[in-house]
Swiss-Prot record:
Its cofactor is FMN. HAMAP family: DHO_dh_type2 (MF_00225). Its main location: membrane. PROSITE patterns: DHODEHASE_1 (PS00911), DHODEHASE_2 (PS00912). This is Dihydroorotate dehydrogenase (quinone). It is an enzyme of class 1 (oxidoreductase).
Amino acid sequence: MYQLLLSLMFRVPPERIHHIAFTAMKLVTRFAPLRWLVAKVLVVDDPVLRSQAFGLTFPAPLGLAAGFDKDATGVDAWGPLGFGFAEVGTVTAQAQPGNPAPRLFRLPADRALINRMGFNNHGAGHAANFLRQRRVTVPIGANIGKTKIVEAVDAAADYTASAQLLGPLADFMVVNVSSPNTPGLRDLQAVESLRPILQAVLDTVSVPVLVKIAPDLSDEDVDAVADLAVELGLAGIVATNTTIRRDGLKTPDAEVAALGAGGLSGAPVADRSLEVLRRLYARVGDKMTIISVGGIETADQAWERILAGATLVQGYTGFIYGGPFWARSIHKGIAKRVRAAGFSSIAQAVGAENPR
């Protein structure tokens, strides 16, 4: 049924259909009777799925990745829609329009998306208004990025401005230095550039702070960021963001080239995201939480990430292609696998493929 609907939606420009679908999600979860009904259908309330991470309780391990709810306008929708948590943003200190349209593209043959949105959002103050009014349903993280017009030398102050507004309202913060769509942003992943940014955010907020990294980092750079995260006392790492690579796609090269620059998400990112997860867990898995994101489409893949060391997992593109029952399907599948493996809770499964 959803595949038929998806084929119809794919006839509408991606950004427009995103707006329509997002509006519908907010509408059906706005009023208590509808919200209750939606949650009754989509939420998997199973004790084996509950876990603790950086002082928070997560009712289920699959969360909505950043990028879908950029301004936190749908912050009350994600729990009833079946997600165990959500990450809003990316939010910048100053409002900005992002890159010119078209800036979001589908690759159906690859079950992937390319985006060059460019952190389009209404600013941290605007998002703060919605976070201030939210109901307490599931944990909400605020993903913050650098304002495009701000020079790299002033990045720490820019991130601090967002953290000051959102830190008191979110359950955790994610510092995004890994989007390919803001010029120079990924350069901030270098340890000497990243250190003052992370320290500034840590000094500003009292909630857990994580950093989100790119799949295109070399293994050595992944290690360096992981070591820095431990040194500074971060709560965790979100791995990974979108990739700038285009190899191995089923979509013809000429079509891909015609779409231009941007970050690729979805199924093609899965292998590298899993590689980065395993590397991070081997290095720092006993010291912090790892949230794995990138190419997760099925319960088997989510379970694989958990066994490889992810305490929590996230999706965005999988939700687009999987539809409204996607989170429910993932969570029911994980619960089944937890019990089949003889575990009493999902926490026992984290990193089980390489026990410490």
